[in-house]
């Protein structure tokens, strides 16, 4: 499985303009907590960055070298938080190998901010839907006030 991940990562990264990924302190705490339950989470997050987030926001070069954006049904904009320069998104379809047999319906959700001009992503929150139903809107508001 490790070899497959390395090959996929190489193929995907060759086709894209890289996005700069950062994590908030709260995200790091949430991630560390979930990592104890779901051991494959670190590799799964890397794969989600390459296979879902980057193709959705930046695109992938097709066989003719033309950049095409991926229509991802996995990513949703969170209403009332988006501006022209900043999009607050939620990644719903997150495949976690530690949750065998569930595929993209793992129940893990990631909330992040995408900066259009700088091509960067700040991860705000990660949670398991079995423990928490929806994203923390207060945390998003706090994040927005701290960066704007």
What role is predicted for each listed range?
Residues 1-63:
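Arg/Lys-rich, positively charged N-terminal/basic patches that mediate binding to nucleic acids
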Residues 4-17, 93-148:
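Enriched for short, Lys/Arg-rich terminal
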Residues 23, 41, 87, 104-107:
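Amphipathic alpha-helical interface surfaces
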């Amino acid at each position: 499985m490790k070899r497959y991940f390395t090959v996929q990562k190489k193929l995907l990264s060759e086709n894209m303009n890289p996005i700069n990924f950062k994590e908030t302190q709260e995200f790091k705490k949430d991630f560390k907590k979930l990592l104890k339950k779901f051991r494959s989470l670190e590799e799964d997050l890397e794969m989600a960055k390459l296979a879902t987030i980057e193709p959705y926001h930046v695109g992938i070069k097709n066989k003719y070298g033309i950049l095409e954006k991926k229509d991802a049904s996995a990513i949703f904009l969170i209403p009332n938080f988006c501006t022209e320069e900043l999009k607050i998104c939620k990644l719903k379809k997150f495949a976690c190998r530690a949750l065998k047999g569930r595929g993209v319906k793992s129940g893990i959700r990631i909330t992040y901010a995408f900066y259009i001009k700088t091509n960067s992503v700040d991860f705000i929150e990660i949670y398991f839907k079995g423990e928490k139903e929806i994203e923390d809107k207060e945390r998003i508001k706090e994040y927005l006030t701290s960066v704007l």
